[in-house]
Amino acid sequence: MLRIAMVSPYSVSVPGGVQAQVLGLARELRRVGHEVRVLAPCDGPPPEPFVTPLGNSLPTAANGSVAPLAPDPSAALRTIRALNDEAFDVIHLHEPIVPGPTVTALLLKLAPTVGTFHAAGDSTSYRVLNKTARWAAEHLSVRVAVSESAKELASKYLDGEYTILFNG
């Protein structure tokens, strides 16, 4: 049995593909006996008892859509506290270079860290934050992409080896 922190930069109380993947994966890992905590922004009551809310999100324009992010200092402090309060064996970051809880967790490097990349197509964020993102990505123990196009985007800007593990 592993103690796993699953960290999302997106509010898990707002519907979205990454949020659904985070909650679904957490449920499945718990079903097979792992202890999983989801650390994420949450607008309102947590959707599951295993979610540690990190504060409210701010609608943020990104890559042609609006993402519910929490890139503020209070969310960072809650992330630090949550990760320090529990001794996790693995930290799994979804969208590890998106500003907010995932970057905070990556900088702490308290356990082996898996980064799952979901974004595909092209990304202004990857282009603009290239040097910082590349530096942050170097701190990942394992890099995962959810599709070939997500792998192409991440490897274009961040280099490294990626394993494709499809959603679901």
Report residues per predicted region.
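Short, flexible loop segments at the rims of nucleotide/cofactor-binding pockets, characterized by
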Residues: V14, V66-P71, H92-L93, A119-S125
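Carbohydrate-associated surface elements
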Residues: C42, S149, G168
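Active-site proximal beta-strand in glycosyltransferases
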Residues: I4, V90-H92, I97, V103-S123, ...
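An amphipathic, basic-hydrophobic alpha-helix
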Residues: A61-V90, G100, V128-W135
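N-terminal strand-loop element at the rim of the active site
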Residues: L2, S8-P15, V22-P73, R81-A82
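Membrane-proximal helix-turn-helix segments that form the acceptor-binding/catalytic region
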Residues: G121-A145, A150-E152, Y157
